[in-house]
Amino acid sequence: MTLAPGRRLGRLALSAAACVALGVVQRDIALERPIDAAVQTSNSASSDALEVLAVRPPNVFMIAGAGGNIAVQIGEDGVVVVDAGSTASAPAVLAAIKRISPKPIRYIIDTGPDADHVGGNEALSKAGDTFFPGTRPAGPRPDPTRAVATILAAEGVALHMSASGSASTGSPAGLPTDTFHYARKYLYLNGEPIEVLHQPAAHTDSDVFAFFRRSDVVVAGDILDTRHFPVIDSERGGSIDGEIAALNRLAELAVPSVPIVSREAGTIVIPGHGRLCDHFDVIEYRDMITIVRDRVRDLVTSGRSLEQVKAAAPAAGYAGRYGNAGGDWTTDQFVEAVYRSLAKEKP
């Protein structure tokens, strides 16, 4: 039976993977135990519950509930973590990672500069161990005897996190120690290639996808957020057209399970927040944003003011699913971000 687009990975998460309590994350359980009743566990380090989900057992896992979603890849070389969660959740995240694998954390890959993704950088890095003895904690007085895990990110992440950047979202010891400004950075760890793909001017100017090629898992960061309309952070270089371009790239990377439709096959996409996704979920999200963008563009072209654009309700038909009347990112804020992004392009 073919599932409706937008619900495929919701079902997959309930049938193909295992969500287990932090105290019992074991490879055999991850492979055999169904996730029909997801188990959440609280811990003394955080009042929030964490969920550990086996995305591609026995190699790729996801930790939810620590701020942004966290991906964990394990193997003989050690542990690779994509995003580190919030500062407050770091002790609980470390405990979860240790129960997934006793190997040291080797790399932390930041998908962007937001505090709920990079806040745990310092704690996770200091708990890890690099392949390169010369790598030391950042900051004015690093411990010269202590090696740490490498923090890899696009160059803009370090700028936004530092005091000299446009926003300060982390301590000096949590700053990236390995940055790049080109389109693609790659690693080969735990038996598979890992591509880190820069997506300029999307959610911010320093977003990346982390693509685990053999596992066929893409970590999308906040370019894809299934909870609401995407956050277009224009102050940090984000734009609506860059967001759509990044989603087009993500749709190209995420191969659907065709012609044989299977809930167990196809590329899995880990969003910045929310449930696991697949190719069709990305397409649905991209199409929704494109339609709203085109509606706003027509209004901008006709000379409408921001208030007139908001009154025209260009997100109608989608606000019920992705909208928010209050909170951190409202429908009005999204429409305003799209308007301001397009107004910059207007001749």
Located regions from the model:
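Active-site metal-binding motif and surrounding structural segment of the metallo-beta-lactamase
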Residues: 76-80, 87-141, 147-149
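Conserved beta-strand hairpin/beta-sheet module of binuclear metal-dependent hydrolase folds
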Residues: 51-99, 208-221
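Divalent metal-coordination and catalytic microenvironments
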Residues: 59, 73, 83, 97, ...
